[in-house]
Amino acid sequence: MSRQSLTKAHAKISELTWEPTFATPATRFGTDYTFEKAPKKDPLKQIMRSYFSMEEEKDNRVYGAMDGAIRGNMFRQVQQRWLEWQKLFLSIIPFPEISAARAMPMAIDAVPNPEIHNGLAVQMIDEVRHSTIQMNLKKLYMNNYIDPSGFDMTEKAFANNYAGTIGRQFGEGFITGDAITAANIYLTVVAETAFTNTLFVAMPDEAAANGDYLLPTVFHSVQSDESRHISNGYSILLMALADERNRPLLERDLRYAWWNNHCVVDAAIGTFIEYGTKDRRKDRESYAEMWRRWIYDDYYRSYLLPLEKYGLTIPHDLVEEAWKRIVEKGYVHEVARFFATGWPVNYWRIDTMTDTDFEWFEHKYPGWYSKFGKWWENYNRLAYPGRNKPIAFEEVGYQYPHRCWTCMVPALIREDMIVEKVDGQWRTYCSETCYWTDAVAFRGEYEGRETPNMGRLTGFREWETLHHGKDLADIVTDLGYVRDDGKTLVGQPHLNLDPQKMWTLDDVRGNTFNSPNVLLNQMTDDERDAHVAAYRAGGVPA
């Protein structure tokens, strides 16, 4: 296509949009942002010549690799420890992808720029493609992996699981609240521009090291589209910056979006990379090292900092606090321990840790053993049924954590937990920023300005409250996490498939599960103060 014909085609596509003159359009997806002074910029023109042929070629490579993996016996070589965590990961990730596709009409409706609508429409096609190839990857794993249990229930399990619902909260953030907050700042400016680096670049590297070369093929195909999505987000960001009235909203949304992405994405991807791998080479990058390179340097220093020249206040404090939580406060390791504590209500198996694992963690995170080593030794000791309860019900010096109302990841850095009465309910938050998000950001007014489109953080946000007072065996049965024999649990605290060493419903029966939040709201003020003080001091029950 010649340059002249490309320009004509681009102009013709732009003419396909119109503003109705016979009626006032209904605002389906509202925003508190204003775009009266916004400049026009269309990212689509740069790729219009080659988009569909390019995507076809990428799909051919993905599905060809899937066929090659089966013919090449990849599943005889891949590490079980790695693929077990993919049951959780691949149950979650298609949902944020399809939510991103659903977010594009929100952005199109909110941004009065027919030119940029073209790029957003193409992004919607991308996101549908991403979700499709990820679902196909999951199906291929299910059909060929030695233990398909868990892969066969992911769409149901992700929606009712204590970990999967965190991912659901993350994906729903793309399509709820203010349209620009959700579909642009939270999704495109932060999630796609920053955190897809660890998600779609660093994680595939770890997959390959564990014998899985399918996930890198699929996710590099996904990541190659992200540069265009980043361009869409940046275009809308510049449009918003053109109007000074948007600056407080942008600064609010950057704080919320950065922190919620950190809380959820770093929790999940950090755990998959650090605890799902068998590759313990000393020269392999830890998640902290990956984060410093891919997010701190490539995103914060290269993308966020230059925005200050437009007068925008960047959340430097939150970036530094996220780094501190990963490096000094053991955030990823706390998440992994929490997931392993909840193994009876998992739909994936979690491997025990070995001396090689211990040595690697101590090398990469000095002091790791003194804080986490003894617990993982107890996890190994309590891995098989018969003489003990699941580790969550044994005395191993670990108190089941409170859930954060905002990000829904538990308050695992216990000294930072915030407890406040909001909307008539005592709620717990993992951090001051998550409390601010619920009590200040997602409200009908912000800094004296009406913000009716932000919405509220509502619903059953604490998984534990849904199962308060139930027997553990009944919870597992209600969730449907039972294998085909009707008695053996899908989740196991080891990778041994010997039926004699796998936990059954009878093995976990007799243990009553209680919700920390329900109990917190039942306490007197003095009891609550004492409980919170003990929790912050290290998690020993008051």
Swiss-Prot record:
Binds 2 Fe(2+) ions per subunit. Fe cation 2 binds at residues 127, 192, 226, 229. It is an enzyme of class 1 (oxidoreductase). InterPro entries: Ferritin-like_SF, Phenol_Hydrox, RNR-like. Keywords: Iron, Metal-binding, Monooxygenase, NAD, Oxidoreductase. SUPFAM superfamilies: Ferritin-like. Fe cation 1 binds at residues 97, 127, 130, 226. Its EC number is 1.14.13.227. One of its GO terms (molecular function) is monooxygenase activity. The keyword Metal-binding applies. Induction: By acetone. Transcriptionally activated by MimR. Its cofactor is Fe(2+). Disruption phenotype: Cells lacking this gene are unable to grow on phenol, acetone and methylethylketone (2-butanone). It comes from the Bacteria. It catalyses: propane + NADH + O2 + H(+) = propan-2-ol + NAD(+) + H2O; acetone + NADH + O2 + H(+) = hydroxyacetone + NAD(+) + H2O; butan-2-one + NADH + O2 + H(+) = 1-hydroxy-2-butanone + NAD(+) + H2O; phenol + NADH + O2 + H(+) = hydroquinone + NAD(+) + H2O. Component of the propane 2-monooxygenase multicomponent enzyme system which is involved in the degradation of propane via the O2-dependent hydroxylation of propane. Also involved in the degradation of acetone via the O2-dependent hydroxylation of acetone. Also able to catalyze the oxidation of phenol, methylethylketone (2-butanone), 1-propanol and 2-propanol. Belongs to the TmoA/XamoA family. The propane 2-monooxygenase multicomponent enzyme system is composed of an electron transfer component and a monooxygenase component interacting with the effector protein MimD. The electron transfer component is composed of a reductase (MimB), and the monooxygenase component is formed by a large subunit (MimA) and a small subunit (MimC). Requires the presence of the chaperonin-like protein MimG to ensure a productive folding, resulting of a soluble MimA, which leads to the active form of MimABCD. This is Propane 2-monooxygenase, hydroxylase component large subunit. It comes from Mycolicibacterium smegmatis (strain ATCC 700084 / mc(2)155). The lineage of its organism: Bacteria, Bacillati, Actinomycetota, Actinomycetes, Mycobacteriales. The gene is mimA.
